[in-house]
Amino acid sequence: MENQRRDSRQEAQRLVRARAAFVCMALCAAMVLPARAAAAEEHEIVVERNVAAKMRDGVTLRADVYRPKAEGKYPVLLVRTPYDKRNETNFGLKAAAHGYVVIAQDVRGRFESEGEWYVFKNESQDGYDTVEWAAALPYANGKVGMFGGSYVGATQFLAAIAHPPHLAGICPTVTASNYHDGWTYQGGAFEQWFNESWASGLAENTMRRRAEKKYDPLGGSKVLPLNAYPVLEAPSGEGIAPYFKDWLAHPSFDAYWKELSIEDHYAQIQVPVLSFAAWYDIFLGGSVKNYVRLKTEGGTEAARKGQRLVVSVGGHAGQSSTGKSGAVEFGSKLAMDGDEMTLRWYDWLFKGEANGVEKEKPVKIFVMGKNEWRDEDDWPLARAKNTKYYLHSTGGANGLGSNGALSAVAPAEEKADQYVYDPSDAAPTIGGPLCCGALPTGIGPEDQRPAEARSDVLVYTTPAFAKDTEVTGPVSLDLYVSSSAVDTDFTGMLVDVWPNGFAQNLTSGILRLRYRNSQEKPELANPGETYHITVDLWSTSNVFLAGHKLRLEVSSSNFPRFDRNLNTGEEQARATRIVKATNVIYHDKAHPSALVVPVVP
C-alpha cells in the first residue's frame, strides 16, 4: 500500500503540471464538430511572459499573454490556473493566431505569482480584479471570457459569482457546483483518493517555494537562539497544505463551505456558460447541476438562456483519441478537436459569427451502448420515464451467483438481505470516477466482477433484456436499511452486464448514514432501527443492448475512492478504532427498496 501511495503521489504531481489533465481541450476531445467559418483569421503572434497584474490588496499575479501582433482590439480568453501557466502555451498560440488575446495567469501563491496559496479562498476577488485588468489592456476590446477545467473551472465560477462587468462568458470543464458535497465529500463520505492525491500534487510547488525562499542575513542575525537562524530550517510538512486539514475538520456543510458554494450564488452569475462534463468524471454531479439550475436561477436572461452542456465519456483526465475509456471500446466517434469547439463557441458569442452554434440544441450527450452522440432539447430528458426496479431475494443476495433480482413488480413478504461490513477488509474501488493518481484496478468503466464476488456486496440483476433499453438521466436508490452500528455507509452502483459476463460500472454513489437527513446536521443512528434513505447515483446515458442485463450493487464501502466509515460514530478524521457492522437491506411490502432509473422510450 505504501508503494502504491508513493506512486500515486508521483502521478498526482505529474498530473497537476499537465494541462491535459484538467483543461477543457483534453476532455472535449470526444466529438466531431462542424468546421469553423472558412474565413478564420491567421494572425502573427506576440508573446509576453510574466505580465504583472496587481490585485486590490497589492499582491502581484503574473500571466503570460499571447496576442495578435497587428494593432487593434481583440476579445480576451482568460485562464487562471494553479497548475503552471506555461502549460497553456499550445492553446494560447492557437487562439491568438485566430484573433484572441489569451491570458494565462498563475493564481495567487502558485508558480510566478505572489501571495499565499489557499484552495478557493481568493479566487472570487482575484478573478474579478483580473478580468477587469484584462479588459482594460490596450489591445483588449472589453469582452473577457474564461476557459479550463477542474480547479480552473472553479476559478471561472468563483469569478462569475463576483460578476465583474467585463466578464461575458465562461467555458468550465469537469468542475463542481459545491466544494463540499461533490468535490471534497460525497453523501457525507470523504473523497479520499482524489483529495489525498490532489493535495499531494499541489503541495509540491508550495514546498519548492519554501525551499527557494531567500532569507535576509541582517534580519536573521537578530534571531535567538543562534541555532534558530532561518537558513538552517528545512521546509517541513507543517503548513504546506493547511486546507487539507481544514477539509477534514469540516465534514459537514457549514459556514466554511457555504461561502464558496456556487449553488448558493447562481443568481449572481450573469453570463452564458458552455459546460463540459463526462459520465466517468468525479465532478459529474456538479457539472450537470450547474447547467440545470442556471437555466432557472441565473442572474440575467442571457445567463438563463445561454446555458450549454456537453457530456462525454472519459474521466477527469480526459480521454484518449482511440475511442477507448477504461476497459471499454466506445468506437471511432470519440474523436474531435476540443480547442476548435471552444473557439467556435466564442467566435459566435464574442465575434457574432453565424457559424451554426446559434442553431444547435443546448445539450449534447454521448449515449453509451449505442456509442453515438445525440443532441437534446434539455436535461433531464422530458420524455424519460422514471422507472422503479424493486429489489428481490430470498434473503441471500450476497455476491455473484446469489438469488438477488430486480423487477418492476413491487415486493410482497420477503426476507431481508444482510452482510457484515468490516472496515479492515473494505470492498475495493474498481475503476469509476477517479483522480489524480491511477489505481491498479483502473479508471472509468472496468469489470466489477471481482467486487461482486464478495459476500459484503449485494447483487441484484434483471433478466436479459429482449430489446434495447435506454437509461438516460439522474439515477437514485431508495433503500430501507438498518445497522448494528451507530453510523455506517451505504453504497450503490448501476452496472451493465454483457452477455459474456463483463460487468461495466455506469454510475455510483454513497451515503453516510449520519447525513441521511441533512449535510449540515449529522445524526447518529439507533442500532437496529429501520431508516428510509436515498442514495444519489448521479447520472448516466446508456443503452442496455438486447441480451444485456441491468444490475445493482449495494454495499458499505468503495475504498479508497471514499474513506472507510469505521462504524463508531466518532470524528472520522481522528478515529482509529474499528467496529464491524451488520447492515441490513429490507425489501418487502412495507419496505419497497428500489432502484429508480429514467427509461427513454
Explain the meaning of each model-derived region.
Residues 97, 161-268:
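Accessory cap/linker subdomain of secreted extracellular hydrolases
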Residues 285-307, 575:
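Active-site-adjacent alpha-helix of alpha/beta-hydrolase-fold enzymes
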Residues 68-136, 178, 182-186, 190, ...:
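Cap/lid segment of the alpha/beta-hydrolase catalytic domain
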Residues 40-72, 461-467, 480-481, 521:
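N-terminal cap/lid segment of alpha/beta-hydrolase-fold proteins
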Residues 221-231, 324-601:
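C-terminal, loop-rich substrate-recognition/catalytic regions characterized by aromatic stacking residues
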Residues 138-151:
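Alpha/beta-hydrolase fold nucleophile elbow
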